[in-house]
């Protein structure tokens, strides 16, 4: 579950952090703790300074050899005995670095958590790479030939029983689909769509390889990939959850919540370079409501999974102006304003991210990609005042080509209640789950932020982007920001500490993670480090307070947007399920690729200040901190 608050019980009452109640679907976490089944961080990341293996003499530059061929050649050199396939989601980022992803195979089946990502520079040489390929003994194919494993229905029933899923499988049957040992289930009730199963291998925690069924079940509040042992039909080896917990009268971009300004009317606010069909068309149909190529926003008071026929305001004159006051009650009385605010914030963020490199080929959320690459049919489903919970929000990120799903809730910690759609930081935080999940490991793989530390960084990226966007013209290095303060009606916000460059106000360092086991708490540490990076870059390059960056040769000219750009580029470089050290290296590599490394000193100083210096070492049980800045970078 990737939501705003779940598992982050640092300051608010327990009720605020409980899993949202759902009227029909949902996993009872008090009985089954999905964190116990999180994937482990297996990857090694070789950064740009460590990639010293020169291309062999037979190597041809880009013009003669494609970047896919160059990357494939590199994988064969590093893992000569491995069999693998190229994942069909490779692309060249707007910084000129190509990203190619590979999946290891065995006996014709995927090893689902064995990945290799290769980043190829403009010169056609390998820039950096991540590797979690399995190096142990590959099982004999005899078990497959003899079909010495359970049938898919047994796997579905085992998954349902072990995780106590609220679905009915008594009449379940399986039908073969395209692909080796791929099935869809019929006769199942309680799911959004028909469950699926694929026979795959999975690297277990003990380093051995298990034949498993990957069972996919979307129960709305949780969209799960469960790896259940194919022989026993009972033992679960890992679980991935895709869910992260005209004229428009709105709080304009940069106003985080009603305490920071008044609503205004904005006209045709889209960026035509990012939203070529505007926000209210998908290239084939022009809409007169909160629907378009990037998102579809509606009310969802019952908390169900249907959305196309849900209520959304309509205006034949395209004048989306509706009354709202923070003192109004109940929230349903201003649902029109809520839907339009959510639609506006999500679309504006889509356009900004597009400018910063999260475009169609990188796996962004668009119904019609207009021939620009990537897979379409995946705008974001935006549910305002979703009835499946309160005091939270969440975002589901399936692979590219399937819609993202954001649920915004009403917050009940104040009188009158407050609507989370009016706090932009919450919307941005949730949407950033989609950004980081699509970029890390590639658009086709949504499994790469499911280890505890990488999941924590997923929360931290959301907080960082939300905080960077709300900076004001008069802000200085000494300015502190909280998260979720307005919606939760809590002056100190919903995190353990405010985001601050003061070690007195916020003392978090890398070794703080040793005592943390919740993703939101870990994310606060990561976002604190990124806040330091941003202010170091602002001190060097200044701060652009406009809603969009000024680019020179693709590089933001100011420190705020440069920090955001490097963070985004780093996501695409880092390996599957990265740790803090690897994500730090990816940001440093992003600077090398984008600027030639002119900001290495500022970035290293920021991380070193918070204990993630050159000598920092990752261990899931005992992280070692360091304040060392490498010699020669400053």
From Swiss-Prot:
Record Pfam families: FTP (PF07504), Peptidase_M36 (PF02128)
Superkingdom classification of source: Eukaryota
Cofactor binding notes: Binds 1 zinc ion per subunit.
Localization: Secreted
Induction: Expression is controlled by the prtT transcription factor.
Co-factor requirement: Zn(2+)
Top-tier EC class: hydrolase
Gene Ontology terms: biological process: proteolysis
Claim: Transport is one of the keywords in the record: no
Classification via CDD domains: M36
Main location: secreted
Keyword line: Hydrolase, Metal-binding, Metalloprotease, Protease, Secreted, Signal, Virulence, Zinc, Zymogen
GO molecular function: metalloendopeptidase activity; zinc ion binding
An example Gene Ontology CC term for this record: extracellular region
InterPro entries: FTP_domain (IPR011096), Fungal_virulence_M36 (IPR050371), Peptidase_M36 (IPR001842), Peptidase_M4/M1_CTD_sf (IPR027268)
Record bears the keyword Signal: yes
UniProt function note: Secreted metalloproteinase that allows assimilation of proteinaceous substrates and probably acts as a virulence factor.
Record-given protein name: Extracellular metalloproteinase MEP
């Amino acid at each position: 579950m990737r939501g705003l608050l779940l598992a982050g019980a640092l300051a608010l009452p327990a009720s605020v952090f409980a899993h949202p109640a759902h009227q029909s679907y949902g996993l009872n976490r008090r009985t089954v703790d999905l964190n116990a089944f999180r994937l482990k961080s297996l990857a090694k990341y070789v950064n740009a300074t460590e990639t010293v293996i020169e291309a062999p003499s037979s190597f041809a530059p880009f013009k003669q050899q494609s970047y896919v061929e160059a990357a494939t050649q590199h994988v064969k050199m590093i893992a000569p005995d491995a069999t693998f396939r190229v994942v069909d989601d490779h692309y060249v980022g707007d910084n000129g670095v190509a990203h190619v992803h590979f999946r290891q195979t065995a006996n014709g089946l995927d090893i689902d958590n064995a990945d290799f990502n290769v980043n190829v520079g403009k010169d056609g040489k390998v820039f950096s790479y991540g590797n979690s390929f399995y190096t142990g003994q590959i099982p004999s194919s005899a078990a497959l030939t003899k079909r010495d494993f359970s049938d898919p229905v047994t796997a579905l029933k085992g998954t349902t029983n072990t995780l106590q899923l609220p679905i009915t499988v008594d009449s379940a049957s399986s039908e073969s689909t395209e692909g080796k040992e791929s099935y869809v289930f019929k006769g199942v009730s309680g799911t959004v769509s028909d469950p699926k199963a694929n026979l795959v291998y999975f690297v277990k925690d003990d380093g051995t390889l298990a034949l498993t069924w990957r069972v996919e079940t979307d129960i709305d509040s949780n969209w799960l990939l469960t790896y259940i042992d194919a022989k026993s039909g009972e033992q679960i080896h890992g679980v991935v959850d895709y869910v992260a917990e005209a004229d428009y009268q709105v709080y304009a971009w940069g106003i985080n919540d009603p305490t920071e300004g008044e609503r205004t009317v904005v006209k045709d606010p889209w960026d035509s370079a990012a939203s070529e069909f505007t926000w209210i068309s998908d290239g084939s149909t022009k809409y007169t409501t909160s629907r378009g190529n990037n998102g579809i926003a509606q009310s969802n008071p019952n908390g169900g999974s249907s959305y196309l026929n849900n209520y959304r305001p309509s205006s034949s004159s395209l004048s989306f102006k509706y009354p709202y006051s923070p003192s109004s009650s109940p929230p349903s009385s201003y649902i029109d304003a809520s839907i339009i605010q959510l639609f506006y914030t999500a679309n504006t963020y889509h356009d900004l991210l597009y400018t910063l490199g999260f475009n169609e080929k990188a796996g962004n959320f668009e119904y019609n990609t207009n021939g620009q690459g990537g897979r379409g049919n995946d705008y974001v489903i935006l549910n305002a005042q979703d009835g499946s919970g309160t005091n939270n929000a969440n975002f589901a990120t399936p692979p590219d080509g399937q819609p993202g799903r954001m649920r915004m809730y009403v917050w009940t910690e104040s009188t009158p209640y407050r609507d989370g759609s009016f706090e932009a930081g919450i919307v941005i935080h949730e949407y950033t789950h989609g950004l980081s999940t699509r970029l890390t490991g590639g658009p086709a793989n949504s499994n790469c932020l499911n280890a505890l530390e990488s999941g924590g960084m997923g929360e931290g990226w959301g907080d960082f982007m939300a905080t960077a966007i709300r900076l004001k013209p008069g802000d200085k290095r000494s300015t502190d920001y909280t998260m979720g303060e307005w919606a939760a009606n809590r002056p100190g916000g919903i995190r353990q500490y405010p985001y601050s460059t003061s070690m007195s106000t916020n003392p978090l360092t890398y070794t703080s993670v040793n005592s943390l086991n919740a993703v939101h708490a870990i994310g606060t540490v990561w976002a604190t480090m990124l806040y330091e990076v941003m202010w170091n870059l602002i001190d060097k390059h200044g701060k652009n307070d406009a809603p969009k960056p000024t680019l020179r040769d693709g590089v933001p000219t100011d420190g705020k947007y440069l920090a955001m750009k490097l963070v985004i580029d780093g996501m695409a470089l880092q390996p599957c399920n990265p740790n803090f050290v690897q994500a730090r290296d990816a940001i440093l590599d992003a600077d090398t690729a984008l600027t030639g490394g002119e900001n290495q000193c500022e970035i290293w100083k920021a991380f070193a200040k918070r204990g993630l210096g050159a000598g920092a070492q990752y261990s899931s049980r005992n992280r070692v901190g360091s304040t060392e800045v490498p010699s020669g970078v400053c």
